[in-house]
């Protein structure tokens, strides 16, 4: 962790050549890193090299010239109970970022997802006159709708990934723009299954099951054992299956290796990152609820969505939720189009059974391919360009660029 203001943001333009200043960004996990990297691409296209970018980000953001001064993993914690173990570090990080950004104000602050962390940072920054944009609306239409009052104090503009969201914010007087979902720009309309399998060196002649138990260690600890037991059952029910499992970090690879050792007969390929290739290669996907469910839909894949959290977290979420489903494909469809097995329903037997049903139902596979193609077309909007345009317009309206 950095100790000085000087280390967080670059010096002002007078001391840094032709630089106008810096845009500060905070992204909290792998999905936010991807979204932010595309926004950075759009900003760099609009602003050239006149602006620096710094804060918290991942490897995709850093590939766009972003400088991350705190580990993104600090924020990669989910759930009410689970976050308590990391709360002191999270709050200390947020306090340090706030103090340093207030001491050396950026041209703009962009919070990317991670709403519980970012809104607490955005409120004082906006109060200090720093333009604030939040990229990714929290799911206020699904649960914790009261957060919209905090959002009204936290942001000057919110960038929405789904077409129904701006109307919700308009009713609360919050400027919001639908920019489409950047994943719809990144993921091809027609997946190259054979190409993905070749790149991952997957076994030939077998049907492929992609398994994604999550990108956070807490998720993999909650779901990993159940998913591996389900994989073992599928392997014993159908010997023509091979599995591919992407891991987002070295610690996750260690957890997965320990689980695989318990089921050595499973034909499993573990890959570092490359979750998109894993899904593109698959005939069916078994995965944790989250952004990956939308990615699987954009790859036009049948899937089974699952999730497990500690009992207390589940009770809190249940009391604050409004919808009967948690997976993005179902939420965007307004109905169940793929099965969800959550909490006590997520047994190895049920997961194996539902995954094989999804794999073998040709009529349902054809329906999902068409349904998800229509969804893809709705979400494809050149997000990087639209989102960057909103940010630049806000900064120009404030006279900072």
Curated annotation (Swiss-Prot):
Its keywords, alphabetically, are:
Glycosyltransferase, Lipid A biosynthesis, Lipid biosynthesis, Lipid metabolism, Transferase
Q: GO molecular function, one example?
A: phospholipid binding
Q: Name one Pfam family in it.
A: LpxB
Annotated EC: 2.4.1.182
Q: Into which EC class is this enzyme placed?
A: transferase
Q: Which reaction does it catalyse?
A: a lipid X + a UDP-2-N,3-O-bis[(3R)-3-hydroxyacyl]-alpha-D-glucosamine = a lipid A disaccharide + UDP + H(+)
GO cellular component labels: membrane
The record, for InterPro entries, names: Glyco_trans_19
Q: Which GO biological process categories is it annotated with?
A: lipid A biosynthetic process
Q: In which pathway does it act?
A: Bacterial outer membrane biogenesis; LPS lipid A biosynthesis
Q: Which family does it belong to?
A: Belongs to the LpxB family.
Function in brief: Condensation of UDP-2,3-diacylglucosamine and 2,3-diacylglucosamine-1-phosphate to form lipid A disaccharide, a precursor of lipid A, a phosphorylated glycolipid that anchors the lipopolysaccharide to the outer membrane of the cell.
Q: What is this protein called?
A: Lipid-A-disaccharide synthase
Q: Which gene encodes it?
A: lpxB
């Amino acid at each position: 962790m950095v100790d000085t203001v000087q280390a967080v943001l670059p010096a002002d333009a007078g001391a840094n050549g032709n630089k106008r200043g810096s845009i500060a960004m905070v992204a909290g996990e792998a999905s936010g890193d991807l979204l932010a990297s595309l926004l950075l691409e759009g900003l760099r296209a609009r602003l050239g090299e006149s602006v620096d970018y710094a804060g918290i980000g991942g490897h995709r953001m850093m590939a766009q010239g972003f400088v991350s001064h705190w580990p993104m993993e600090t924020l990669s914690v989910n759930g009410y109970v689970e976050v308590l173990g990391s709360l002191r570090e999270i709050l200390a990080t947020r306090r340090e970022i706030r103090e340093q950004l207030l001491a050396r104000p950026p041209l703009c602050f962009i919070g990317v997802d991670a709403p519980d962390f970012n809104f607490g940072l955005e409120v004082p920054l906006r109060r200090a006159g720093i333009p604030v944009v939040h990229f990714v609306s929290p799911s206020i239409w699904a649960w914790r709708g009261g957060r919209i009052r905090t959002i009204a104090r936290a942001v000057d503009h919110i960038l929405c990934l789904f077409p129904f969201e701006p109307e919700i914010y308009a009713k609360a007087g919050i400027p919001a723009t639908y920019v489409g979902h950047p994943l719809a720009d990144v993921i091809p309309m027609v997946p190259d299954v054979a190409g993905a399998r070749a790149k991952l060196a997957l076994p030939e002649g077998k049907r492929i099951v992609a398994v994604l138990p999550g990108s956070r260690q807490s998720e993999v600890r909650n779901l990993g054992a159940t998913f591996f037991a389900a994989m073992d059952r599928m392997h014993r029910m159908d010997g023509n299956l091979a599995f591919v499992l992407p891991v987002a970090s070295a610690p996750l690879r260690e957890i997965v290796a320990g689980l695989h050792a318990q089921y050595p007969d499973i034909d499993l390929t573990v890959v570092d990152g490359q979750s998109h290739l894993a899904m593109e290669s698959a005939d069916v996907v078994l995965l944790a609820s989250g952004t990956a469910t939308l990615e699987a839909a954009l790859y036009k894949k049948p899937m089974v969505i699952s999730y497990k959290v500690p009992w207390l977290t589940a009770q809190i979420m249940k009391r604050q939720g409004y919808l009967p489903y948690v997976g993005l494909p179902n939420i965007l469809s307004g109905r169940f189009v793929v099965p969800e097995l959550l909490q006590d329903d997520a047994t190895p037997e049920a997961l194996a059974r539902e995954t094989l049903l999804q794999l073998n139902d040709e009529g349902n596979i054809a329906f999902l391919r068409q349904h998800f193609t229509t969804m893809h077309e709705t979400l494809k909007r050149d997000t990087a360009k639209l989102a960057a345009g909103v940010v630049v317009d806000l900064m120009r309206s404030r006279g900072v660029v």
